[in-house]
From Swiss-Prot:
Region (Disordered): 139-163
Gene Ontology CC terms, in alphabetical order: cytoplasm
Function: Involved in peptide bond synthesis. Stimulates efficient translation and peptide-bond synthesis on native or reconstituted 70S ribosomes in vitro. Probably functions indirectly by altering the affinity of the ribosome for aminoacyl-tRNA, thus increasing their reactivity as acceptors for peptidyl transferase.
Family per similarity comment: Belongs to the elongation factor P family.
Record organism: Methylobacterium nodulans (strain LMG 21967 / CNCM I-2342 / ORS 2060)
GO biological process, alphabetically ordered: peptide biosynthetic process
Annotated protein name in UniProt: Elongation factor P
Biased composition annotated in UniProt, kind: Polar residues: 142-160
Cleavable signal peptide: none
GO molecular function terms listed in the Swiss-Prot or TrEMBL record: translation elongation factor activity
Length: 188
């Protein structure tokens, strides 16, 4: 299916010269003088090579048919990350390069959306928010509440983030998976 380049987003799959590419980032650039362009950073699915392409924003690009299906994360090992389709109980092994830095947020039993093209996993979409425990953070300093300040904290998955001063070690917090930012204290 042909679409205009400016409508492409991260995670979309395009076909170019008979090969499939997953879009890592898409940026619409509008220079003061000249034609607006869409800058695409893509990864070739067959061998993982990263390429950058520029298209005029109105240029037609072939978008590949990709099936998005819900899967449940089971475990990870040397072969990759293993997911199960909850309807058919079919298991899929996803290579580490497809998951990338999102691997830190995967938890056993987590429901994710896997993008598949002819049964081959291309991309993964995690839930927007995930609940994690703070394992380490600095103690609060009295009188530091005059301005809204945040302090560094290490989460149970090893990711470092900024949390409000009232959060202590052992507290469960809600984190955005897109950027690792603090949302709120968990309500459980």
């Amino acid at each position: 299916m042909k679409v205009i380049a400016s409508s492409l987003r991260k995670g979309n799959v395009v076909e170019k010269d008979g090969r499939l590419y997953v879009i890592l980032s898409a940026e619409n650039i509008h220079p003061g003088k000249g034609t607006p362009v869409t800058q695409l950073d893509m990864r070739r699915i067959t061998d993982g090579v990263k390429v950058s392409e520029r298209y005029r924003t109105t240029e037609q690009v072939e978008r590949a048919f990709v099936e998005d299906r819900e899967h449940t994360f089971l475990y990870s090992d040397g072969e990759g990350f293993h997911f199960m389709n909850p309807e058919s109980y079919e298991q899929v092994a996803v290579p580490e390069d497809v998951i990338g830095d999102q691997a830190a947020y995967l938890q056993e039993g987590m429901a994710v959306m896997l993008s598949l093209h002819n049964g081959v996993p291309l991309a993964i979409e995690l839930p927007q928010r995930v609940t994690l425990e703070v394992t380490e953070t600095e103690p609060v300093t009295k009188g530091q509440t005059a301005s809204s300040s945040y302090k560094p904290a290490t989460l149970s998955n090893g990711v470092r983030t900024q949390v409000p001063p009232h959060i202590t070690a052992g507290t469960r917090v809600v984190i955005m998976t897109a950027d690792g930012s603090y949302v709120e204290r968990a309500k459980d």
